[in-house]
Amino acid sequence: MRQSYRYASGAVVRRTLKGLRKLILCQDLRQDIRHLVRSYADMNISLPISAPPGWRLDFVEFEDIFGSAAVTDGPETPWGQLICCEESLESLGVLQFSTTVLPRVHGPRSSSEDEDSDDDDFFVYVEEIEPPSQARLVLLLGRYETVWCLDRDRGVLYYLAHSLDDFARHGLLHCEAIYGEQMRTPLLTTQPDHIICDLRLHDNSISELQRVTCRYRGECVPLRTPGEMTRPLLLCGQAENLKGVWPFICMETEQFNDLLKFFVDRLCCETMIMGVVGESLPSGVFHADFVILVDRACEFFYFDVSRREIWRLADSVDMLLTVGLLKIYQAGRRFHYAVDDAERLEVPGRCPHENFPFWDRFGTVERVRASTRHHELRYKWLIRKDRFIVRPDWCSMRNSLDEVSGTADVSWDPRIRPDYPQTSDLECAKQYWQELNDHVREQTARYGPVRRYSVWCGMSSRLERAVKRLQQRIPRQNLMNPSLMNQGLCVYYSDEEEDQEEDDTSDDDDQEKETENPQNNIGSLTRTPSSPGSLEGVEERMLNVMKEAVAEQDRKKTQKKHKIDTAQRRVLTRRAARAAVLEGRPTPKPTMPHPVSYLPFWM
């Protein structure tokens, strides 16, 4: 789904762009960017982020964040193993949240939002900045104004925006990293309150969550996403309730059962259908766009009806009620390791560098040099006062509020521009051909090799055993036949108890190592010889008995938690093994009704 054009008011967007003015002008030279960040850091100034309120960018140098021994270029950089292509990113600073240091807020404005002041109020001065080395989020700037965010705690790299203007319009509102548990972001979806309370109280097990969902089946929950329109979530609870929604109402029994098997096969564990997200149309039938699924660990996933794929949606009920469908809007902007993505069913990162060679062709003309680039003109065009004007009495006026917003606003993809130099044009310009060829080769070398995104690169011994067992169960002709794969053939441990003895054996070994901890035998280690008849001996024996009882309770809790973790780890291993076996092969997809089957037989 395509996100909205902007999440902040026109005045806030212009104020943020004014704060980014020098970055826009000096983006071609890395040394100028570093010098600018150093000067801002010496002045202790920060730039408020446009959205959401309270977030700011503290300008900090690279050495102060990662240390003097950190590498700034190549695969050894802090983000070198995460980014899709080897690109030189410049550190702008760290992202901090504070409710005490906020920019000056203007009063309510009329529809003519362009009359914001030209005062230099786009920076805030912070007296005390938290230690940058302990900061969790780092903002990075790439070529052609691409903006990245590095989550140091989780080891995840996010592609935030394709330009500084895009970053000013959207801010961090769709950055998944700011909605962590430590931030305690308030819930967006709060109504109906009785349904929300029951869902939050019974999110510990899938059986309790299913019982609550079945109690409210047929009810609609307005699922809210930050900055986007509210979508209705129709609660189902059971698979049979899915047959009353479009297009599943057109599916035959066998086809519907294959779809349910696909859900279980993809998640590698028991699955609950929580509900569907779609639209309630005047036809009286609810049209589903996404099916919300819940696995054994009460983690949420979505099935895209049009793409026929299952991906991760939220880690818990609270996260679902906080971010809504945020992961669907930001699909492909999260860069992590292939094994972890396969275990979590995250959408693999989509390389944004495919546009760079296209943009490079505009700079291959001999007369185009760094001194003649129109960065200043672009900046003035972006901060023009009439950019966000809303005049309802002018029906013939188009502005940046529309989807077709003009060259400097949205038409950033060079492949859709009519002035893009085609191959035939380049062949005709023989005097520039050699220069173009050398320039493209130079830029390709600058980007560096593409990172090998493969599950086989992060293979562990447990995962290797799971892959071997899975390959033995799947007939080779089924894997090599694309027609069978496209018909919905799934690779899965069909039996839940398959090879359980082997897994339990390895798990028991790990459990014995964990339980053989000296702290678990506090009573036996703290005993000292004393006379049996003395008062001190009686008190000591009672104390030892109490310690042994407490240690036994802790041991039982640890074993129970270990058993749950073992079951969940087995599920994650199966998902990674499934991804490894299917790597390079057609992805299994269920068969969905064709639009022809929607029509009545007399048509």
Curated annotation (Swiss-Prot):
Pfam families to which the protein is assigned, alphabetical: US22
InterPro entries in the record: US22-like
Region annotated Disordered, chain positions: 496-536, 549-568
Annotated Acidic residues bias: 496-513
Start-end of Polar residues biased regions: 517-533
Ranges annotated as spanning the membrane: none
Family of this protein: Belongs to the herpesviridae US22 family.
The name this protein goes by in its record: Uncharacterized protein HHLF5
Organism from which the protein derives: Human cytomegalovirus (strain AD169)
Gene: US26
